[in-house]
A protein has these predicted regions:
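N-terminal basic, low-complexity leaders that serve as flexible interaction/assembly modules and, when applicable
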Residues: 1-79
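Aromatic- and acidic-residue-enriched segments that line the glycan-binding/catalytic groove
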Residues: 79-91, 143-147
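A structural signal for short coil/turn segments at secondary-structure junctions
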Residues: 62, 128-129
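A gly/proline- and charged-residue-enriched helix-loop-helix capping module
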Residues: 89-127
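Conserved alpha/beta-domain cores
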Residues: 54, 135-142, 146
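Gly/Ser/Thr-rich helix-start
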Residues: 26, 82, 140
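Beta-hairpin (beta-strand-turn-beta-strand) motif
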Residues: 72-74, 89, 139
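Proline-centered loop/turn at the N-terminus of a beta-strand
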Residues: 131-133
Length: 147
């Protein structure tokens, strides 16, 4: 079992598990190399092979105790047919919020859009050493509506 799960299950507190938020990202030269070839951030999140590779980069470099899946909280509104744009230097924006598109989104369509995210989680979990944990995340509704 991983250090993180041992601590969460109150089995072993002898060693504090280490990971940090946004551990995969622009400070890593290997990530910057991938970004040069893949300028569309959202497409990068939906490429399960690249998302898996990016997720594992900091684990290989720093031997952290947990990996955080490479994704973004805005994949959810994107899957709900909202216009999401990532602009260099400005960050993400949700343009022209459309409640009708959101309400009309069928569950099957929504899940289909998110399939690559699930695939990245499965691939990462399969590749990740058993002594490492995998952390996934999602934005709460209030956080998402702020965009």
């Amino acid at each position: 079992m991983s250090k993180l799960l041992n601590c969460l299950n109150e089995k072993d507190f002898s060693c504090v598990p280490v990971w940090f938020m946004r551990q995969a990202g622009r400070y890593l030269p290997e990530f910057r190399q991938i970004r040069l070839q893949n300028p569309d951030f959202l497409k990068l999140c939906f490429d399960s092979d690249l998302a898996t590779e990016i997720t594992l980069q900091p684990i290989k470099r720093f031997n952290l105790d947990a990996a955080i899946i490479f994704s973004d909280i805005l994949v959810i509104p994107h899957a709900l047919q909202q216009s999401i744009v990532f602009k260099e230097g400005l960050g993400p924006k949700c343009y022209d919020f459309n409640i009708n598109k959101l309400l009309e989104t069928k569950e099957k369509e929504y899940l289909s859009v998110l399939t690559p995210i699930y695939s990245a989680i499965k691939k990462t979990k399969k590749t990740l050493s058993k002594d490492k944990s995998l952390i996934a995340f999602v934005g709460a509704p209030w956080t998402l509506i702020i965009y």
